[in-house]
Amino acid sequence: ITRRLGGSLMTALIAFIAVFVLATSLAVVASLENGLRLSRERLGADIMVLPAGASGNASEVLFCAEPVNVYLPADVERTVAGIDGVEQATPQFFTQTVNQSCCSVIGVTRVVGIDMKTDFIVGPWLVGGTLEGGALPPDGIILGAAAPPIEGGQASILGSVFYCVGTLEPTGSSVDETIFMDVNAARTIAAESPYLESVWLNVDPFDAISCVMVKVKEGAQPSAVAAAIIEQVPGAA
């Protein structure tokens, strides 16, 4: 009986060790897969669609375009999203703070409006992987790793008060110096700013975007997709 009991205990111990090793291996594999997935997500955009005549800094294309005061119609995003070879497309709307009493942020700082429903540029870099409350509210802002400090968690930007709901990990790109907010909030403060009145003489900010960031499908050639975009989207470059 003692031998049988000892044999059973040994068998149980071996089985436990085997299960433990398997579970540990699976955890390591899952961790590696999550790391690879996050790395893929953080690669940013393959193509940046800008209005013709706007210059883009190639070193910034993967993450965030340089802000320019020229625009594309908002429906360009839908057109681009439907082009063969496009996996994801998300719009951005640029504005900026000014060195005036309407802005508590020190210095002139890039402000980029994003659509969190389609965004794949900012989300993967969020500290903690998510926003406070799980969404980007109309009065919420996300700070790049090197954006100007916000006193008390809130800032006045072009006359409107915003609250910090998230921060980004360092990217080594212009994203680090950028303040992000909801795309419609960015349009609203830009439209109401007396410092930007001349920009909107011929453009409706609520029907405008600054660029479309594009990620191509696996196996698709970015150059071919870019050529198709230029062909199908008048005024794009």
Task: Please report, for each region that a protein language model flagged, where it lies by residue.
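Hydrophobic secondary-structure segments that place a key small or acidic residue at a functional site
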Residues: 92-95, 104-117, 121-198
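Mechanotransmission and gating elements of multispan inner-membrane complexes involved in transport
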Residues: 167-237
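N-terminal Sec/SRP start-transfer signal
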Residues: 1-23
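A conserved hydrophobic position in a structured secondary element of the catalytic/binding core
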Residues: 50-51, 72, 114, 143, ...
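Short, flexible, solvent-exposed loop/turn segments with mixed acidic/basic and small polar residues
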Residues: 11, 130-132, 199-205
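Membrane-interface junctions
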Residues: 3-7, 38, 170, 218
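Short acidic/His/Gly/Ser-rich catalytic and metal-binding motifs that mark active-site loops
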Residues: 55-59, 120, 217
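Hydrophobic, regular-secondary-structure patches
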Residues: 20, 24-108, 136, 227-231, ...
